[in-house]
Curated annotation (Swiss-Prot):
PANTHER family: HYPOTHETICAL PROTEIN LOC681367, RIKEN CDNA 2310039H08 GENE. This is Peroxisomal biogenesis factor 39. It comes from Homo sapiens (Human). Coiled coil: none annotated. GO terms for cellular component: peroxisome. It is found in: Peroxisome. May be a peroxin involved in the PTS2-mediated protein import pathway. Disulfide bonds: none annotated. Pfam families: KPWE_dom (PF17733). Keywords: Peroxisome. InterPro entries: KPWE_PEX14_dom, PEX39. The keyword Glycoprotein does not apply. Signal peptide: none annotated.
Length: 101
């Protein structure tokens, strides 16, 4: 004896209807459309591939070789190298106070 079908399984349900996993399994087994699933029509194109718009990223060994070949950075007139901790102290909120000796 066959079980009576629920209205969601016999007719395509809307995208907002909630469907249980058992109902989804039943729809898949019957070859029916799944509710809320967008069907994409993807086809292979056998023509010329499109050109990349982004520049190629260097491989890690290429990036290391490039870094070694670049000249060392130079300072601009009127600037000094930052000492470690100096930048953090200058940008800390004024409500932060150091405590202790």
């Amino acid at each position: 004896m066959e079980r009576p079908r629920s209205p969601q399984c016999s007719a395509p349900a809307s995208a907002s209807a909630s469907v249980t996993l058992a109902q989804l399994l039943q729809l898949v087994q019957q070859g029916q459309e799944l509710p809320g699933l967008e069907k994409r029509h993807i086809a292979a194109i056998h023509g010329e591939p499109t050109a990349s718009r982004l520049p190629r990223r260097p491989k890690p060994w290429e990036a290391a070789a490039l870094a070694e070949s670049l000249p060392p950075p130079t300072l601009r007139i009127g600037t000094a190298p930052a000492e470690p901790g100096l930048v953090e102290a200058a940008t800390a909120p004024s409500s932060w106070h150091t405590v202790g000796p």
